[in-house]
Amino acid sequence: MPPPPRNSSSASLSATPGLAKGPNNNWPTHLRHFRRSSHDRSLEHAYSNSPGDTVSSNSTIRERPSSRLSSRLRTERRWTVTVNESLARDEVLLNLDLIGDDIQPGSLVAIDVVKADSEKPLQNSHPRHFQDRKDSATAGCVERRYICVAKDMPKELKARYASVEVYVAKHVADAFAMRKGTQVTLTPIDENNPALEASHVELCFKDQYLSRADMWRMAVGELAERTVYKGQMVLFMGTVKAQVTAVYVDGRKAQSAFFGRHTKPVFRSESARYVLFIQMAREMWDFDQDGSGEIMFNKVVNGFLPALFKKWAAMKVKHLVTIVLFARVEYDTGISTELASASAHHGYYTGVQASEDQRPYKDFYRVVVSEMGSGEWTRILHQLKREFNYFRKDISTYHQKAMEPTNSGEDSGEQEVLLNRIKAEASRAIHGNFLEAINMASSLYAHDYIDRDLTRTGVSVVVISPSPGVFEVEYDALRRTTEALACNGIGIDLICIPNIPLHSVPLFRYRNPRQPGQVQRKSKVDISQGSTPKQTTLTFGSYSSLAGSYSPNKRIEGSRNGEPAGPLSSQEEWVSAIPQWLHVSYWTGASEEELSYQGIALSVSDATQKLPSDEFPIRCRMYDLQMRSVMETNEIETKPLHTDPCYPLNAVLASQISKPHFDLDNDGNVIIPNARVPETLFDHVFGFQKFAPDRHRKPGEKSIWRQLQEYDDCRARLPSHRNANQTRRCRDHEETPRRQALEDTSPLGTSYTDRRPSTASQQTLPELSPYHRPTSQRLEVPPVNRKSMSAQSNKSEPKASSSPLKAPKFMRHISLGNRGFGIAAPKVATAEVSMESAGASKTLTPSRSSQDLRVTPSKPGQRPSSSRRLTGGTSTSALSPALSPFSFAPGPQFPTDSPTRPIVIRNQQLEPAAMLSGSSILATTLRPEPVGHDRDFRYSNAIRAEDAKKLYNSKLLAGAIPELPSTLSPKTALSPWLTVLNPSNPDTNDVDMAMLYSRWQHVFPRPQEMRIMKWKGLCSPAAVPLTSEYFPSRDQFEAQYERQPYNVSQDFDEELQEEPKSRDELLRELVSLRFSQGFQIVVGPAVAKAFGQKQVKVADIFSRNHMMEDGISIFMSVGNTIHQLSCVNGTEVEVNIFVRKPTDSFGPSFSSPTLYKPAIRTLLDGGYRTSEFDLVAPKAERNWNYIDAFIAGHNDELTEHLRFWRARFVLIPMTGRRSSMPGTETGDNEEEIRIEGIRKLAQMWQKHRYVPPNERRLQGSGSTRSKKDTNPLDIVYKTEDASVVIAAELETLPLLEGLDRKGQLVRNREPFSKKNINLAALAEAMQQPVENGGVRMQNRRWHFRLHYNCFIGSDMTSWLLDNFDDLEDREEAEALGKRLMVPDDKEKEGKKDSGLFVHVEKRHQFRDGQYFYQISNEFAKPHPPGWFNAKRGQGSMPSTPMGEQPPRDGRPSFSRPTSIHEEDSPESGETTPTAPQAPAGNKPKVVLSRVIKYDVDHRKRSYRPEMVELHYDRLHNPDNCYHLRIDWMNVTVQKLVEDVIENWAREAGQYGLRLVEVPIAEASAISEINPFRRPYKIKLAVPPPDQSPVTYYDPTSFTPQAHPGRQFYQKAILRRFDFVLDMEAASNFPSNVDVSYSWGRPDFRYTQYIHRSGSILAEITDDGHFLVLANRLYSSRAFAAREREMQKELRVERQEQGPAIGTPGLGSSIRVITPSSYTPYNIPTPLPPYDSSPVASPALRPVTTTTTATTTTAAPTSSSLLSPVVRPTLSAPGTTPGSTSASGTPGLTHTPNQGQPGKPPSTSATTTTACAGGGGPGSGWSTWTTREPEWIKDELENFCLDAAALEAFYRELRTAARATTSAGRCGHDAGFWCGWRWCWCWGWAREWD
């Protein structure tokens, strides 16, 4: 369970004694100026602690016990190892009888391998390698140490191996270099000899789906409190496999270490989904800056991508790759922006650029590769290069086609001229649609719990861009993307092609959002990438240094004439932010073949650091500079600062020397050394009364401040006067606050007068994170401006700010009173905020009385602004140079001589907002630095926190402090997922890892290695870590979060549990569920700080037997949601949900429309099509109370609130398959085999159905008959589609809800016994009405054949079980049924009492299944009048026998299947008879499926019940697909679900059924889920004729009718190409019947079909066209398996099979193996030679139409028995489906049929077709097997585009109906004639007779 925070050392030590980390040094402070080498060292020191170890943590940290351990090893006794070669459950066993009492059973013991003398390192070594030798020696010691739990050998082993001392399993011995006879030492683990705890453990897995809950359970079950070592194989629950690939101890790789409570597991997937986005910006066509002669795109396609794919191939990973090219095209209409506003808002455009010339633009996306296996990287690169040739042309000319006029005339001519004037070109990368692409990629997998792929884990998005890592974005897009990525587990990697820039990356620059009420004033701000120093109006937040480009004078001089120098609108405030969810890297070229990763706070790579310190490389290429001959070899003119002889270099260098001990000043005060780089040019000042920098200097020492001041005085000479403009602006500066009164135009609740980016003002920010303090917090005031700024600041201005537990540092350093830059009077503001109210306390300075505090209400009706709030490390624009140097807000005006800075508190919601000067009630969201480590706070005259709380409470009671606002400002909304800083000068020494990487922090073992990182992240993406250390600070937690509490307790009446769950188990379930939903456990001291406590009792998540007691909590977070799970009241779990407040509304800009309208061209599209996506729709909040109640057992219904996993499967009927099960009776046709396969599956489902304990108890205490299996699955088989059956036979359908069977309710007879059977009495009982306990007997139709007064074998089996006391199961009942059959020989002899019933066709013995039987003539009762609606002699029969069953009421009993009258009907709603009218007000309800709880862990490998909900069809047509759907919520291991599905697939494959996963949504709706996929439309070249076929049978009659079904010809085409029905459209069902499934109502718009291979879906639209879509859920690993097996089978068949074996009617020389021979789960289906057994459903097997050699018109219908996939010549050039060469199966030599019995006579003609490409019979197999969907699509399209073939096909359909007229007269099963020329009745009537 969750570990406690690391500041609770006692708990840590008691939990795992002796655990220690590696070396953890507290490195000294570095001062501001340092060289590049010292810069590197400081980075190493900054990262020396393990991630998350804060200085405030009180955890005990021990040194690595290398020296102490080695000394002990020399004196300890050695023991001998014996290797256990057999399979052992225990890894290490100790013979404690020989070892002694030093080691107790159950204690931790370390096994150290004693080095041999030859392995010891040499004693002499170079001194400079001393540290390396020390580390290597320590590592060597660690590598040979194995820690285990001591366990004594069993007595039998001791008796057998009496001399064995240490018994080690072989895999452990191999990993630690132990052999038989190896000497080891045994050392108990205690505080003197601690175990070396691993900081990170990496595990890799492949070909399986692991949820994060699975990862947690695996870590706890197999890794926790054990030694882990590199190469270790981990097997969890016997099915989940993973391998330990790396072990880290404090960032250093180790061979092994102990997995303790602080160890962080990192799971990496080698079978993930990759989406590669390539930004085709304008720079992609530019030449490389390095002068290599390559354009950018060539570097991508010839450099990076081949290197990436080769890495994948070397690691043998199995990823699915999707590649999308995206670009933004800007349009220059040739007129000014003002005049072009109307055209800019044309519906064609996606939006309008907010920068530069505000050009309209259109976003384009081109899908090049869609979910292709990573092994086919050569095809991927070829497709990329091919698409590159056309991409630029397509996107540049698309507007001419999309905007072309539709009408003719003069207007259209003028519009065409205007279109030709429009200039279209790709935008620069900085202005591209970068965020939109990421947002769309994240939407791809936002619902990954639907259609769950059980073979892949993880999604990784890689964006390849020609940008150096800088993007200008819209605030809205950044906020949406940030919120989307903060809550999912998608990793985003940015690969930049240019060189690494000199500033921090990745960088997003955006304008502050404009809130309603703010005045927007247009002012051109140049944000072009080509800005030069000559430009006066500069970009805020750019890459220039603060002292240069952003000096106040330059900005003032850049003001245009007539433009006021007052405050500009917030739209022109630029903010530079770094996202936490984006990891950037730079492709450095093919020579290095490695990625140079750019850390957030690191600005240069190693290659740059190798340059001499006095050489400055020019990194930007400007045209003006190049024309002035400024080349790379020129030296910079300005000398470095330290080369000046006047510069106090020695003082600066001396100040960088670390001081290990605290010093005392002259007054005896403690001088605490800095733990980070000082934030100002001078050292920290500790006095608060006056500015005295020399106060703390030592006697006789000149302070560094004084030396730097002298240097400034020497070099800087201020001008003696100022010009008029400066004087006027200074005056305006002073008068602006008075003019503004209570106005506020800034989104942050602060306004300002002059936007001079003096960095001193940026110190007004409240406390920043101790790890990531942006550069802007350092005081870097240019000396030239110091006095002028002081002169301008002689007025005290109201300042809106917020203050956590201490005041902002800059406020404590500088006062802006009339004293200029002096030390402010002591004042500290504290804030203590609760959810109900919030406020802050004000500390009065000694020089001011409480009378100076005044409360000023704001103007009624005016919208107050929020005070400044910055969110966790992402201080947004307040830290950027665009922010106000000094913020002024309306408030009380103090005298000008006041040294204090009044801070206004404002309320956004209350009209009379009370304002309290002095501090803000709104705390910043920046993480507070540890209070104990802040010397300014500890050693000042600040007020105590408890006193401040008292003062605050008194003010709160007095009503002086308003409530907190209910919304957050737009700036705060981006925090803490963005880090705002000055990109050109970041603070490199204060990087908060929890802030920097947020969710991904614990993935990186060594953060300091981010500059150069290999390919691990790109080759095997990591899952979101289980733990995180980020937690909001106390102030932001109280001010920005709302609390929602509730309690959860276990439902003790839950039926699913044998024993109710304990609270520990319930808590584990709640934690596991949240893990699977993306939550992370929060560890570290941040939680305790946020709650204002020294420590918080938290559970240890990685402990196996950690007992939960009241008061223990677990904190979990995801995005803006925090959950606190606490144990309370002995048995309950209290859940506190903290949700961040919503973002404050603001007016959207005109360039951000509500709907995003890009142009997308999918893989198969011929052109771009504009699509609309709603990216603004808010995400629905989840009802966690309901979810937790479901886990606790209070409800068991899976609803959409739960976001449960779900997957849909179909069983596709295959042709030419035989059952390979031993003992299967011969004589079954294909249809009967498939039905038998479904029955076997149903028995498996029934066997492993989860039975609740109460039912089990009833079965245990009930009679014998209660234990019998009564087959409750109750599947009804029909030979028509469900819609037709419901419309025609509603009343007799047992699926009808609200009805009740009365069978077995009346029993007036004694039960029978198989020992003494009276056949007459038994026959009488069988033939009773169903209400009286008889067997259901009725007329049944199967296809076109009618059987009178018959029953079904499964019904009889259930009846025998119910009426015989001595039958135990269905097998015995089936055996009894066989005894009751009439034997064939007895019937021929005419003997009496030979049996009760016979098979209707006399082909089968009695079997439990869908077999029809009739009572023999001897015992058959005469039918009373009205028993049947039709007489036997009639040729036509109505479909619904009305007198068969009396009306029923109540709910039907589905204890056994009940067959119904069968008949045929057209596949259309036009001739479908209406269902019987329901009573007024209520529709009859029909449920087509049923759900059961299925146990996926019947082998009991888990510690808890593992259940899924299995939905199965109850009404099934064997010609169509059988549907399955599984839903699950909290299964322990997802691999259990996959194992069950594989078992089902294996079982079904032996009965001619293929199990394939298909999407839950229909094919036409794929674009709503995946914007980069679209169904492919195929139109018919010739529309189908309106004339109907001559003969067609109505469902109510056998007489020929002339009413064809709607889309009759389209369905015939699909059946011709081996498509079978998957799901009917909702409109097909009768409108007067309430039809539903167990999972919901039918919602398909079109009827969907699926190919028998399972690889492609097809739909028929309302206008008669086809929509085709590849089934990407079809498991890709089946392709390779089928390819290998087919090639092998082909080789074998060529050698062994003779010409007489093959396809019937074709007699091919080889047995063709179709691609459908293998299932998605690599299960081969039997493929014996086809025989001439009867086929009851000819519609499934299209029979070749044999024609003479001279017949060409029938060629289109001469398709072979096989799938069209195996006929590649139809797609070959020059060959059309209508040609003679397309007849038959290409590549096969057909021999004439020599009169096979029962077959129509074939011609003697021999048709020979060459294989495509001229190869042999198997030449094409290896290429098209992986392209099944493309082959099927191409073949179907070629046929539909061939007008001659279509017309011939239509004629065939019309004339084929004539052949069926005799089928009704013969009285036998008339075969389905759709598309095939001859009647099946002719072929099989002779045999059946």
Swiss-Prot record:
Compositionally biased tracts (Polar residues): 47-60, 747-766, 787-804, 840-853
Region (Disordered): 1-74, 515-540, 551-570, 716-808, 838-900, 1252-1272, 1424-1484, 1724-1824
SUPFAM superfamilies noted in UniProt: Winged helix' DNA-binding domain
An MF annotation (GO) of this entry: GTPase activator activity
DEP domain mapped to chain residues: 1331-1417
Biased composition (Low complexity): 865-877, 1737-1789, 1801-1811
InterPro entries: DEP_dom (IPR000591), DEPDC5_CTD (IPR045838), IML1 (IPR027244), IML1_N (IPR048255), WH-like_DNA-bd_sf (IPR036388), WH_DNA-bd_sf (IPR036390)
SMART domains (UniProt xref): DEP
Stored Gene3D superfamilies: Winged helix-like DNA-binding domain superfamily/Winged helix DNA-binding domain (1.10.10.10)
Cellular component GO terms, alphabetical: GATOR1 complex; vacuolar membrane
Keywords associated with the record: Membrane, Vacuole
GO biological process: intracellular signal transduction; negative regulation of TORC1 signaling; positive regulation of autophagy
PANTHER family assigned: DEP DOMAIN CONTAINING PROTEIN 5, GATOR COMPLEX PROTEIN DEPDC5
Protein known as: Vacuolar membrane-associated protein IML1
Organism: Chaetomium globosum (strain ATCC 6205 / CBS 148.51 / DSM 1962 / NBRC 6347 / NRRL 1970)
